[in-house]
Every structure is written in C-alpha cells, then in structure tokens.
Amino acid sequence: MRIVSGRAAAGVVKKLASRGAELNRLEPRVRRIVDDVRRDGDRALRRYALRWDGLASKQPLRVPEAEMASAWKALAPELRKSLRQAAQNIRRFCEWQKPRTWTRTRGGISLGQLVRPLESVGCYVPGGRHPLVSTLLMTVIPAQVAGVKQIRVASPNPPAEVLAAASMLGVLEFYRVGGAQAIAALAYGTESIPRVNKIVGPGNAYVTVAKKLVSFDCAIEFLAGPTEAVVLSHTGTPEFIAADLVAQAEHDPEALAIFLTTSRELARSVAANATRLAQGNPTAQESLRRRGAILVAASREQARQWANLIAPEHITVAPEDLPFIHHAGSVFVGDYAAQAAGDYASGPNHVLPTSGQARFRGGLSVTDFVKVITVQRLSSRGLRAIAPAVECLATAEGLPAHAESIRVRYERA
C-alpha cells in the first residue's frame, strides 16, 4: 500500500470525497435488458438466465421448497450451527431496531404513528466470486422482523449453502435468476415472478444500474457499489489494522481500503503487514494496489475530518474517536471489533451505503421494510385550540377553502 502525506494526502481525500458510482456507461445496455423483461416476461427472463446464469433449458425458475430443504439437511453440522448463531444475532438486533406504534394526547388532540410492514419485497443475493449466504440473512431477516408477508429471493445459480440458509429462514419463494433481468422481474413482474413493492440487496454494476432504472416504479434501499474500508488509528495493532483492510479488499478489485493515521511508524508497519497478509490473494493484492492507500494526517483532528469527508461504508476507530464520526455506514470500535464480524454474525446489517451515500443514510435495517403512517384525532376542544392559527395561515397562503373547512367545524362545536 502506498503511504501518502501532506498536500498529496489531502488531495486523495478530496478526490475520495467527490467519488460516485460510475454507472452511466452501462445504462443503455441495462435499459435494453429491463425493457425486454418488462415486455416479454418469462421468455426474456429465461433467455438471459440460459445465457448468463447457467440455467438448464427445462429447469424451473422457482426453486422447489424440497430442494431447499434437502440442501439444509446435507449441510455440514458446523455450518448449520454457524448459520443459526448468525441468524439469531441478526434477528435480535433487528428486534431492537424495530420502530413502534405510539400515541400521545394533549389538550384534546391525539397524535401518533402506525407502523405497517410493506406487503412484498424482493431480496437480491449476488452470485459471482463467492456464495454470499450472509447476504441472504441480512436481507431476509429484517424483512421478516418487520412483518413482510411476501418475501421473494432472487439469486443466479444459487449454491447449496444459500438454498440451505433460505430453508432455515423459511423462505418460500426463491428464484434462480440474477443480474439486471432479476431486478426487472421483481420490479415489474412476469408470469412466474409477481412484482414486489421494494427491492433490496447488493449486486454487480448491472444490478446497480437496473435498480436505478426501476426505482421510479419500485422502491429500492440505495445503490450499493464496491465495498469500502477505512481504519482510523494512531496507536493500534498493525496486524489487526492490516487484516481488516485486506479482508475488505478481497471482495473486489475495485474495493476501497484506506488507513488514516498521524503515525508514520504505524503507517510503515501496517503497509508491511498488508503486503504480507495479501500474499496468495490476487483480488486483495490488485485492490490494494489500485485503490488502497495509507494517508498520514498532520493531527488527530485532521484525520477525523478526513474520515467524515470520505464517509465510508465501514470504519474502524478507537473509542475516543467515536464521538467525532458523523458519516459512515457502520462503525467498529476498538482492536477486537473486526469488520468481518459485522459482515457475518455480530448482528448489525452488512448491506451498507457506499460511494459517499453514508452522508445521508445508514445501512439496511428493519425501517427499510415498514411504512410509518401518522395519525391525528381532534376533539372539538382540540380543534378550537388551534383553529385561529390554522385560519390565519390558510388566509396568508390565499387558500380560503382551507380556512372555511376549519370555521364550519368550530362554529358548530
């Protein structure tokens, strides 16, 4: 990893702060796929699945429940135990996060909110280099805790581990389709796949562009790009820091791995450890070479400022730095809070905002699967208390019918 300091380091941060997802070049190609599926339904979906997902010509798009159950039965006992533990921790955290219905009454006015689950969601589980069974847990469990009744999972050529996890969670609808075509099917529906209210889950650039295109007709959580890891430390353990950077770098050659520090000695040690730990891991090596950097700040305040400007997906900090972090998808505190723990089993979600989106939202949560509906009930006493203010404001805005709708009520009250 390169070590950068002074104005050059500030320049790197400035460039990172203005980063965004490079999606425009793919848009025409992805739009054709989305339009094909929207127009031709299963015929287009199966054509793309045959070409890109390895689907057999007569293989059903929907995975039978028996196939998922068989995958669970065949799973190694140790992996079953690990999946159960991870699912339990994720579910518990989701229960803590769940927004509540409430009502407050004062002066004849009762106000509150209703929390209602979405009726249907699509959970996308990417294929690619690794079978991301953890993404199935992270997308399905919060939807279940929220109370979503119709949960549809889509994944290209799903491996046995993913099908097994789906069986463990009680998933009933699982479709072996992926890419932009899967997003289009979930958003608009086909003969085999009913449309959903919202689509969540990460994917490759084609999936991300497809989510962007369908977002005018179907809700999405956000557009997720390549993974990002930042570590902010001045006295930490070099091997631990390097291990976190390499762990996230192995996801993708485009993954971002940044270490922020004021210590040149620690910078050199982390660089050496990262080189050592990335040996034999070509993806991590390429990622660290292309998008990895160690930035040496002039002060702790500057390092904190840089962290917030980058607004990363993951960031590891010392306890004393936590109060100063305002923009991040997920924060890991202390030497033993490995970022991989959050990727799998500690409980918080690993579907997190990238490309600077952490400036305005957090990661996937139960709140993404519910609607908060406000409720208000006014007695005649309550209406009288606010009627003058409402009439005055309505008149000021030039909306006399608004004012009259108040007046006709309190005159009879």
Predicted regions and their residues:
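C-terminal core of ALDH-fold dehydrogenases
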Residues: 300, 305-413
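N-terminal Rossmann-like NAD(P)+-binding subdomain of aldehyde/semialdehyde dehydrogenases
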Residues: 1-119
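Conserved NAD(P)+-binding/catalytic subdomain of aldehyde/semialdehyde dehydrogenases
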Residues: 170-256
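A glycine- and small/hydrophobic-rich beta-loop-beta segment
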Residues: 247, 251, 259-328
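Conserved small-residue-rich beta-alpha loop and adjacent elements
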Residues: 104-165
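Short acidic-hydrophobic, aromatic-tinged amphipathic segments that line or gate anion-handling sites
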Residues: 1-8, 173-178, 294-299
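Alpha-helix C-terminal capping segments
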Residues: 138-149, 167-169, 187-193, 211-213, ...
